Regions:
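Active-site-adjacent betaalpha module
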Residues: 1-33, 67-72, 83, 89, ...
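A short alpha/beta connector and helix-capping loop motif
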Residues: 30, 48-81
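Acidic-leg catalytic submotif of subtilisin-like serine proteases
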Residues: 33-43
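Short acidic/His/Gly/Ser-rich catalytic and metal-binding motifs that mark active-site loops
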Residues: 42-45, 87-88
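Glycine-rich, phosphate-binding/catalytic loops in enzymes
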Residues: 50-54, 94-95, 177-178
Length: 234
């Protein structure tokens, strides 16, 4: 698992600017969605096109957050990347990666194939949301209908988990924030290839775009933000 602590001098600057470390000190759980980005075989399996070795370590935290989000009355959304052919994304697949890398990604992310499937240790449920995207961001309206679906369910807060921290998770989180969703990246619910890339993304995000919380902190927020009637019934 990546380290999740920020240097004290960085936290001091946050407090100087914001008056506190965390942007969102409370959430309304019924208006909250846990968004799980690209936890697919393509990014979790050994030798897959986008393998992130640490991604598999996220599974216990993601499953816990999914259970807690459902129990609190929120929405769980599973986002899967999909590609059909290189012509669907020419600037990236024809220019920014080698041809053999592009072919590997298209092969692994073809809907119906093994690479496109969710990692088998995850615990999705039938009533969860399942959406597909064809760009890095799940909150780019031309690439994914997730923003519209969440708005229709009166969601105003999103919790971002998945992989890669500094690519699809970050792109999704930034676009969510720019679309006026209160956005929290989960520090031990995202993974990438290096600690440096992971922490750099989280530092920028909490400083400018939204908030960063651990899974344990997020569980506490979800429980505290439950409707009183739901909490009393339990």
């Amino acid at each position: 698992m990546h380290p999740t602590d920020f240097p004290q001098d960085f936290l001091d600057r946050l407090v100087q600017r914001r008056g506190r470390v965390h942007g969102f000190e409370a959430i309304e759980s019924r208006k909250t969605a846990l968004v799980i980005v690209d936890m697919q075989n393509c990014f979790c399996a050994a030798g897959a096109a986008g393998e992130v070795p640490l991604a598999k370590e996220l599974v216990p935290n993601i499953n816990l957050l999914a259970r807690e989000t459902r129990a609190a009355g929120g929405v769980v959304a599973w986002v899967q990347s999909a590609l059909y052919k290189k012509e669907d994304w020419p600037v990236f697949l024809d220019t920014l990666v080698k041809p053999e890398v592009a072919d590997h990604f298209v092969s692994d992310l073809m809907p119906g194939g093994e690479g496109h499937k969710l990692w088998p240790s995850l615990e999705p449920e039938t009533n969860d949301l399942f959406v597909t995207k064809n760009r890095f961001s799940a909150f780019l309206p031309s690439a994914c209908n997730l923003p519209q679906v969440l708005r229709e369910r009166s969601i105003d807060t999103v919790l971002i988990t998945g992989t890669l921290t500094n690519v699809c998770s970050e792109s999704s989180a930034r676009d969510a924030a720019m679309s006026d969703f209160k956005t929290i990246m989960i520090s031990d619910g995202n993974a990438t290839r290096t600690d440096e890339d992971h922490l750099a993304t989280l530092r920028t995000f909490i400083a400018v775009f939204g908030d960063v919380r651990t899974s344990a902190e997020t569980v506490a927020l979800l429980r505290a933000g439950r409707p009183k009637m739901l909490s009393a019934a339990e």
